[in-house]
Amino acid sequence: MLCFTAFHFRKDVPLGVYLVVLNLLFVFGSDAQTTTLTFQYGGLNRTAQVYVPPGSQPSDSLPLVLVLHGFTQSGTTMLNSTGFNALAQQYRAVIAYPNGVNNGWNTQSGMPGASTADDVGYLLALADSIRLRWGTRYHRLYSCGFSAGGFMSYRLACERPDRFEAIASVAGTMSTTAFAACQGPPLPPSFHVRLLHIHGTSDGVVSYAGGNGNVSAEQCVQSWVVRAQCPSQPVVVALPNTYTADGSTVEEFRYAPCAPLGPVGTNGAGRPGQVVFLKVTGGGHTWPGNTAPLFGLGNVNRDFQASARIMDFFLGSGAAATSSELPNFTDKNPTWSEVLDGLSLSNDPSEGLWDFWGRRYPVHPTNHGDYDSGLWLTRYQGQTTKWLKLPQ
């Protein structure tokens, strides 16, 4: 017997995405924690594996993290080698492991065998399909990747900063073509994308110093510092060398606070952005903390775990500025009626409700499903903007 699901069609979602989701309903079950998605995009069969934490419901509006493999690898490589599934349970996030065409991504590199597929379009269609199926949050979209997957994450942030809240690149920079296309005037605050870049100085595949059609790791980071309007001088901290036998050490370069990640016209109401660079001196073309054999080439740093650091940067304490950079929290834990009273009637763009990521939300007087419990920013009737802890 066939079971059909009712859909509420939205104008802002292309019809093709709905057709993808309707097709997927017939090829996988809804109970599995890891699901293989297969659909056509741009005339090509595209696949991805998706992990959903146990017990999650679409109403939870979880964030979505794309984990992109390196050249010659696959989504399965990343799933089996990086430990993101366990972290997804801790941080309550959906993880997607897409597959590139011919095990590569269209990074505009000109490298022999590189993909020419519309990977930006595919990955956004995948994100929209997952959002419609599992209820992930539209603006809580992240991408990270190894090597070519890092290149692709940079391209996503350059071309679609309106969709991604943050990216992370491990051993991946930008091609000179992609880098040139990414340059331009500073973006408005609501289009800033936070960056975490991790790179070994002894990387023999994607050189730390650049070359072979790629820019250097430091050039990538510095361009993002300018793009996000960060301080020119970073705070530099040496990570403890807890594992002395790995032939490498780590320095963290943190550029913060950058331009506020909030809507224009709110007087910097959004939290400050940031750029973080982890320089692994002596590190190879590897994923720090990884123990899987044949994953990369060269020294593997063991002083930190790249996957854990990425998830913390995306969704944990690393996602926020320091306490001194944030407005004081109020002790008040208001009811919904106290928070929403009057806001739904206001047409003033400087008033409203913003989440912790600086995204402005329309206020519905009765529909509270769009708002998570936790910290929200409110401004009403010319009052000073302030953070409020909304109830469960």
Regions found by a protein language model. Name each.
Residues 30-64, 76, 82, 90, ...:
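A domain-start/cap signature at the N-terminus of enzymes
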Residues 201-275, 289-304:
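Active-site-adjacent alpha-helix of alpha/beta-hydrolase-fold enzymes
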Residues 231, 318-361:
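Residue-level detector of functionally pivotal "anchor" positions at catalytic/ligand-binding pockets or at interdomain
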Residues 73-129, 277:
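Active-site machinery of serine-nucleophile hydrolases
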